[in-house]
């Protein structure tokens, strides 16, 4: 008998409301044959006899439809709802949500970008249970939050969680554009983090970046512009009240010491402070209003392209971010501005290649190019000067000159603090590259068995230029012959700009090789993982640092019966050169159990408690962030 010829079918893809789905993926199961729906949700495809179609679209439940004898199909797909079938990212793998026995919190990209912030750590504040965040500054480039998972877990000064981006340890967490993120998971207890061994004591943040989906190219743009302002600013005394209270303090001192009371300010001085008729020699400076803008700006733009075929899928993203400071009058000349500023460019490409039916590859590259400008005195130094400056010490800037008053009580001048300490310009460049290969051995050895290998190369370069210049300050004096005339006497000379430079660079190479097993036998489901990894960190710019290496062996075994009884064992055996010889390696095991009570026959079916799981765990983890370099310790 001769094989039957392929036949042509047509159809329409709609949602539950009858609206056409544009760009839905229609694939003949078991082949590379497929197409996407057009603007009206229609498609035409030649298929083999007895073909089964798989229809998928982002945000909708994947649906399979047997063709049978139909020549025209009307296919309805439903929106996906979050369920226990949802897959969550765990250490070196993925698990169904219903099978997880560890403590894991998750947030999706859609939820993440609902809060527009300058970095991801600030987007997480108040969004995930067990996560504690401290924001110590609001200055551009310094406003990232410090994160703690379930509080302080170690005795060292570094209590930050381990950051894993697409399975690789990386530190440029807050430089990632949130539009590049697919999901973010936090591993909180030892049963979840023991697989990271000596690095898992402070918890782990797992970031998975976006990948392409099969279908036509999708171009997406997002942008936002924000005005930022201080949430709360202190109120200070005006000059008249300050002078009055200063006189009262002198009077109280004289009573205690028995000396003659001599007021510092006359009634006429206080009246001039109050009425503002002599604004230079009797100023009433509100340093908050004089020094700070009402608003600063933040701008963010992202454009990304995604799509793919059965063989190649891609995600390409580029973004721009800019955040300005809140100080006034900081542009010294056309080339120099001491106002804080954070500017960043992000680029990312993720490619997935299905080379054969069993062999696949992933190539990822990300770059962050950033520049941060900070005042030479530091933002904390400027705020300290504003807090300590009294309102009668200076009229501020007069004709763009820094002016002091002879009787300013020795107060600091915030303008001199800001302008005469110059500024620092930091350039920070990160490049991350990853190659991952995966081979499915199901057809060669046994079903559910696969091997994978990864290699990553990360490079970081930092350069600093510090610009310094001394600005003259002037003393205001009244002309003895013409009391209406006030002249400014220079008290220091202006210097030319000087520049000092510095730099730093480092690189890291990471490799891993793993064997995965995932198999279901009736009501029994088991998974296993054995993985070897190593990394080497090198920083040639630092005098006393020597290359730092890490090696580890990772294992995981899970068992599930009837989606009811769950057991999991994780272990990490790893070591680092941060410790002395003979004490570099440690074994970190963890075991966890789970019982899905709601799957038992005796559990009453109701709409109040639909799912109930009890779990418990025990594990040991370590911390290698003990500070300093090997020789210094």
What annotation goes with each model-predicted range?
Residues 230-232, 279-319, 323-327, 338-413, ...:
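Flexible loop and strand-edge segments within Gram-negative outer membrane beta-barrel domains
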